[in-house]
Structures are given as C-alpha cells and as structure tokens.
Amino acid sequence: MHYYVDVVEREPQAGSAAWSRRYAELQPRLVRALAATAGTYVGVEDAVHDAFAAALSADREQIDNLGGWLYTVALRTLRRAQRRDAIARALRLPRAPVSGELERAVMRIDLLADLAALSGRERELLVARHYFGLTQDELARSFHMPRGTVSATLSRAAAKLRARERTR
C-alpha cells in the first residue's frame, strides 16, 4: 500500500479527496479484472499502480470511463511486463522469486479456470465488458478493432463459458 500513498500525495490538492475515493473504488476491481484476464496475479498490482500513476498525468476530463481507461492502460502495461519476462526467461536471466501460495489458491477458483480456457482476446474483452461495463463501441475503440470483431469475440467467449458450465 505504500505506492497508494505516493499516488495520492502527488494528486493536486484540490481533487485529492475525490481521487482517493476513485482509487479505493477502482483499484480492487482492476486487480481482480486483470488477474482474471491474465490468469495470474503476477505483475497485476504493479500494472494497476502504473495505470493510476499514468492517470495522474493524463487529462482526466478527456476520459469518458475512468475504469475502462485504467483497465486498458494496466492491461497494456501488464502485457509489456509479460513480454519482458518471456524474453528474460528465454535468455535465462534470473527472476525474483514469487510466492506460489496465493497463485495456487487463485487457480482453484472455477472462474479463473473458465477464463483461462478462453483465448487472450476473448478474456480481455469479456473482462472489460463485465467488470467495467464498456460497450461494444467503447471496446472497439479501446482495443483498436472493428465493432463486429468485438461482438463476435464476446459471443464466442460467452458460448464457450456456457458450454463449460453445462459440463459441470
């Protein structure tokens, strides 16, 4: 939580109480959404904090849906970190140890198992849609893809989840 204090202290004085409330409201949802998207909590909190830091320097009046904007920025940050980690693994660079206890507990949750069965794109769009209420048009703009692709991807993801539910 130390990073939370740093983020709040850099917020301009006039809006700090409002910004603190938004952080408290959105941060847990963003962490859950990114973990659901990625299928892991590794790197998620860092990506969320980086997204909030980016929001501090962004023109927030130009952001229609702060939760969706933060999710998109955090997802891109997480993807970059995952690519760097993949390169480090390929080069066999040492990596800091991660506690596996939380990871094992999270992986036992049916929802994460179901989401893991989806493609990355399906997972990202479905989580953004249901955690942050982004419309298909907003998803298309945020993810730089045609609206029809968004619609088809969401339908395919929902069908896969329904099929998994029927097999339980």
Predicted regions and their residues:
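A short, charge-rich alpha-helical start-of-domain segment used by transcription regulators
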Residues: H2-R32, V42, E61, R123
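Internal acidic/polar
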Residues: V5, R80, A88-L115, T135
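C-terminal flanking helix
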Residues: Q27, V31, F52, S119, ...
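Structural recognition of an alpha-helix C-terminal capping motif at a helix-to-coil junction
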Residues: D46-A53, S57, D64-R76
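Arg/Lys-rich amphipathic alpha helix in sigma70-family domain 2
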Residues: E61, N65, T72-L93, E103-R104, ...
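DNA-recognition helix of helix-turn-helix
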Residues: L75, R79, D137, F143-R168
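A short pre-motif secondary-structure segment
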Residues: L125-R129
